[in-house]
Amino acid sequence: MALLSVLPVSLWLIAAGTFAVYHAIRAVYLIFFSPLAVFPGSPWAALGEYWEAYWNIGVKPGRKGQMLFKLEEMHKRLGPALRMGPNEVHIYDPAFYHELYRPGSRYYKDPSMHKVLGAPSSTLAESDPVRHKQRKAPLEPLFSKKNILSLEPMLMEHVDRCSQRFDELFAQGKPVSMEWALKSLAMDMVSQFAFGQSLNALADPEFKSLPVRVFQQYLPSLHVIKAFPFVRLLNSLPLWIAKRISHSVEMGHELEQFAARRIDEYMAAAAAGKTPTFPTLMERLLIPIPEKGYAVPDKQGLRDELLTVISAGDDTTGIANTVTLFNIFNNREVHDRLLAELKTVMPTPNSHVSYLQLEALPYLTAVIKEGLRYSSPAASRTPRLVPPGGVRLPDGRFIPAGTRVGMAIYHIHYNETLFESPRVFDPERWLQGPEVTAERAKFLVPFSRGSRSCLGINLAYMEMYMAIAYIVRRFDLDLVGTTEEDMKWDDMVVPQFHGEFMALTKRRED
């Protein structure tokens, strides 16, 4: 009997000892003998993903999303290549960017990273280049500049509606939360492009409609999901239980229900013969293209595609417009020069002008380029997998095949060797002659580069040109207590500002 009572304790001790020895040996190997041990970095990074989680989730109360900035500081001390995981290297060298993300790059997307987004059946998450090309077949003509130009009247309706809301709030003596307003504007534009019908986010009294709020709250939760993938298992629990455990599960469920409702509504409208006057994302997704290998996705695939397009088109464009407008109205010299240029094609605040005319304005173009650089709305790193054969860096160090390697758009846009005084909003840097501007433009990468770059680039540019031009020409924004400190941000997948950009939106008289 005594032997039986002691035996379980002995087994537990043996198991615990084996576990401890295994992890001790693994730690020694990872830190000192792994092929990636030649790269400097925190020893904690070599041991697991939780070093990154510390900086993105819990570095200190009230301040998260600091990994991006910690990497910047470490690169300046330790060099252009850092170890940031058991199987990951982060690169800071701008010259490597166009190798990693060029067209035809052999560095494929890491499936595990992009499935964190919660839309595993989307084109964005597809890592296989052949399947990715097939998935893009219906999307490329839809996002072409020619097709996007046909959307101009629809986009103009939303800009006018946004202006009306600004007038209403000014008449009530209420300041506008510009970030929420501009995200609502972007949401209405991209949702009508996706479904043929706007979500009418601009109608919300505070610009905080459910879809805008859900995306605002869901994206920061991806840091938690990346660090603790088992959180997704909560989706299998009844919602009333899961949402008590994790707010991100509730937000994810809201997103799925939102997309499913929109698909059902679109199908019902199409069955009733109600079709939009312009091509929509849903319409194109429902047309097979057998010669290009594209088959119509199932409902989950449609849902995932719609969620990624709307998410990418709402937050990022809204953030870029928010940062750009703040810096215009916070800098009198930039403001006055831009307004004077706009008056050459828009003689009165009520003037309408074509997108192509706006696109031809050099200072407006410089302001928008600088806004995209300065805001870096998709700032985080985008990891790829090192191809077979590995890669040798210019300094001779070797990265084995299968290693995750990535760079961050923010680190390119704020690199002092590429952009002098990068923390200064300076549109003049884009007006220093064609050769200098062309060289700098190689490293303006808000939409990434290569075959995996953002499909929505033409739509985003049109939205920015129209929003910036018409708001600046129509309104004299009076900042209400907003400072540059408020516009600093944490990397919560997309920038999350420390404060709020509030402004009284007074109509110009001339």
Curated annotation (Swiss-Prot):
Keywords: Heme, Iron, Membrane, Metal-binding, Monooxygenase, Oxidoreductase, Transmembrane, Transmembrane helix. PROSITE patterns: CYTOCHROME_P450 (PS00086). Belongs to the cytochrome P450 family. It comes from Penicillium terrestre. This is Cytochrome P450 monooxygenase macH. The gene is macH. GO terms for molecular function: heme binding; iron ion binding; monooxygenase activity; oxidoreductase activity, acting on paired donors, with incorporation or reduction of molecular oxygen. One of its GO terms (biological process) is terpenoid biosynthetic process. It is found in: Membrane. Cytochrome P450 monooxygenase; part of the gene cluster that mediates the biosynthesis of macrophorins, isoprenoid epoxycyclohexenones containing cyclized drimane moieties. The first step of the pathway is the synthesis of 6-methylsalicylic acid (6-MSA) by the polyketide synthase macA. 6-MSA is then converted to m-cresol by the decarboxylase macB. The cytochrome P450 monooxygenase macC then catalyzes the oxidation of m-cresol to toluquinol.
